[in-house]
Amino acid sequence: MASISNEPERENRDEEETGANEDEDTGAQVAPIVRLEEVAVTTGEEDEDTILDLKSKLYRFDKDGSQWKERGAGTVKFLKHRVSGKIRLVMRQSKTLKICANHLVGSGMSVQEHAGNDKSCVWHARDFSDGELKDELFCIRFASVENCKAFMQKFKEVAESEEEKEESKDASDTAGLLEKLTVEEKESEKKPVEKAEENKKSEAVEEKKTEESVPSA
């Protein structure tokens, strides 16, 4: 009798196990509800070549508080544009990729070692990292003296190169202006001569008309 009374329980267990197995593996393929398309990520650096990149920590001088404030830790780069040849300094925070510094390195800019620390250096720049041009005083710190020297050397090379370009352009513009003035002077010298020749021709024509108008004897 005991064996008979246990049969329904066994059957119920078998049905539950079978149902559970069917729930676990139905063989159905579920398609995703939303399909995510690949989005091309642009950084604005696609048309530029990196000529130097170093890990560092950047600070800016807060004029109101008269103290240095950290801008972020990441990689500082010198980027050269393939078309214009202009070189800018860009630094992004390593974790968020937020821009800490973004400015051109131009003629007249200078960089110098920070007082009392040969791993740091400072410079002034018209920075655009916040979406508008601001006069900033930056200080950057590197892990080694060698990296700091490499940064300063490249900074100076770029600034000097831009200064030479400006001097060359000024010289070219001056030469072009002088050439234009010379041409104008030559043209002004020609005008009196041309005018005299025209007067002679006019006089000759008038004389001929006069001779033709005189009746013959």
Swiss-Prot record:
UniProt xrefs under CDD domains: RanBD_RanBP1
Modified residues (N-acetylalanine): 2
Keywords attached to this entry: Acetylation, mRNA transport, Nuclear pore complex, Nucleus, Protein transport, Translocation, Transport
One GO location term (cellular component): peroxisome
Biased composition annotated in UniProt, kind: Basic and acidic residues: 181-217
PROSITE patterns assigned: RANBD1 (PS50196)
Disulfide bonds: none
SUPFAM superfamilies: PH domain-like (SSF50729)
Location(s), subcellular: Nucleus, Nuclear pore complex
Annotated PANTHER family: RAN BINDING PROTEIN, RAN-BINDING PROTEIN 1 HOMOLOG B
UniProt-recorded name of the protein: Ran-binding protein 1 homolog b
Protein species of origin: Arabidopsis thaliana
Organism phylogeny: Eukaryota, Viridiplantae, Streptophyta, Embryophyta, Tracheophyta
